[in-house]
Amino acid sequence: MDLKKQYIIALDEGTSSCRSIVFDHNLNQIAIAQNEFNTFFPNSGWVEQDPLEIWSAQLATMQSAKNKAQIKSHEVIAVGITNQRETIVLWNKENGLPVYNAIVWQDQRTAALCQKFNEDKLIQTKVKQKTGLPINPYFSATKIAWILKNVPLAKKLMEQKKLLFGTIDSWLIWKLTNGKMHVTDVSNASRTLLFDIVKMEWSKELCDLFEVPVSILPKVLSSNAYFGDIETNHWSSNAKGIVPIRAVLGDQQAALFGQLCTEPGMVKNTYGTGCFVLMNIGDKPTLSKHNLLTTVAWQLENHPPVYALEGSVFVAGAAIKWLRDALKIIYSEKESDFYAELAKENEQNLVFVPAFSGLGAPWWDASARGIILGIEASTKREHIVKASLESIAFQTNDLLNAMASDLGYKITSIKADGGIVKSNYLMQFQADIADVIVSIPKNKETTAVGVCFLAGLACGFWKDIHQLEKLTTLDKKFKSTMDPNIRKTKINSWHKAVERALKWKEID
């Protein structure tokens, strides 16, 4: 085959928008198309989206990207799909219509149900051992249970054996294949609270616990399996050639693969509104003693699964947005580096803990609230901006230390991606405070690149990881220049501030 005239399209379905990106054999980005879709908040803590709007938006970007690239469908060698995780859709398999809106991963409507389950420590332990996850509204199981209990049409279709469940990847695959394939991959299945990550299969015991019938669940495949062919009517009326779906990964796992964190101990951090830190831990699902998640990273066909430890920072870029929108002390996020550098001229020991809605791992305190300590009469806006950027690095450092403690070795480097890696001040401070090398790739679309790589390996577009390494180039690298004693002092100040932020709501 003439590789110069072959392409891979990555479908990247995110939480607020979806994109399609066309890549060539040299990983050049030939074309990109993006569409946003609506999010609804019908009640406090409820977050929903329209599955049909997601589908039409994603399909439109796929068609648009192909047309922008001026390529034919028969020149597309494969498609890969990456998606927002945990979000659920239930639909009628006879007409393809959803029975309810998609319940999004941030949705908290099942918090009381999760709390009830968590009161039983035996159940809590069993679920963690099987899934690597805590019982939390974030994950899919209790969302499914809510629809089955509260939507009469769902109950009726379930009794008639006409109901199907899927995370967003399953929903898109089912639509792209015109209902021929009801499947998911191991990375998405591992986020449902229904998948045994040791046995690598749906757990009948967990399905019974959460009252979810196994019959509505998709078949679980390896991450670079054959997920079916995209029907020609989704390209154009005169489309020729069969285009297979050859890779599926949850978005954070896709970023891990896109950063080529393919060896145990390799770490990536996606710096966005929040942060997602994932570490490849190899083929054994080590359970964290520091409340990190253990999840399936990916599984290649005829290979054992690869697992990851995952930790989240709730507020990262959101802290900078808060400075702009709420405090109005900066006009754009781009100004943050300028002010942070300005603050270095009059250094202060100012610490900001942005616990707007609690703190995640390793603290796990929903009652924690934001706090700024060390304010003096000479404190100016630049000191608060600097402390805000530094808070992102401090929180990431806490996660890296938790991962290192779980696995018994020091982390020496991380690969960074996401919107706020543009901040040179943040990246340098991250290297300094964690004493790591921070590497940033030239191609910032690491999520899409991850499924592109996986699809390309599956269909022979690329031979192996070594070939992929030659396609990835570094944009920037940051190394620590901080004195170890200064680092220790700064971390101690951070932890003192965190201690004061914990259990704040209980003071009322």
Swiss-Prot record:
> Which reaction is recorded as catalysed by this protein?
glycerol + ATP = sn-glycerol 3-phosphate + ADP + H(+)
* Residues binding ATP: T15, S16, S17, T273, G317, G419
Pathway noted in the entry: Polyol metabolism; glycerol degradation via glycerol kinase pathway; sn-glycerol 3-phosphate from glycerol: step 1/1
Q: Name one GO cellular component term.
A: cytosol
The Enzyme Commission number assigned here is: 2.7.1.30
User: What residues does ADP bind to?
Assistant: T15, R19, T273, G317, G419
Which residue pairs form cystines in this protein?
none
- Coiled-coil regions, chain positions: none
**Binding site residues for sn-glycerol 3-phosphate:** T15, R85, E86, Y138, D251
The alphabetized UniProt keywords are:
ATP-binding, Glycerol metabolism, Kinase, Nucleotide-binding, Transferase
A single Pfam family it belongs to is FGGY_C
Give the UniProt record's GO annotations in the biological process aspect.
glycerol catabolic process; glycerol metabolic process; glycerol-3-phosphate metabolic process
In what way is its activity controlled? Inhibited by fructose 1,6-bisphosphate (FBP).
Any single GO molecular-function term of the entry would be: ATP binding
Residues the record lists as binding glycerol: R85, E86, Y138, D251, Q252
* CDD domains in UniProt: FGGY_EcGK_like (cd07786)
**Can you tell me which family this protein belongs to?**
Belongs to the FGGY kinase family.
Q: What does this protein do?
A: Key enzyme in the regulation of glycerol uptake and metabolism. Catalyzes the phosphorylation of glycerol to yield sn-glycerol 3-phosphate.
UniProt xrefs under PANTHER family = GLYCEROL KINASE, SUGAR KINASE
| Protein's name in the database | Glycerol kinase
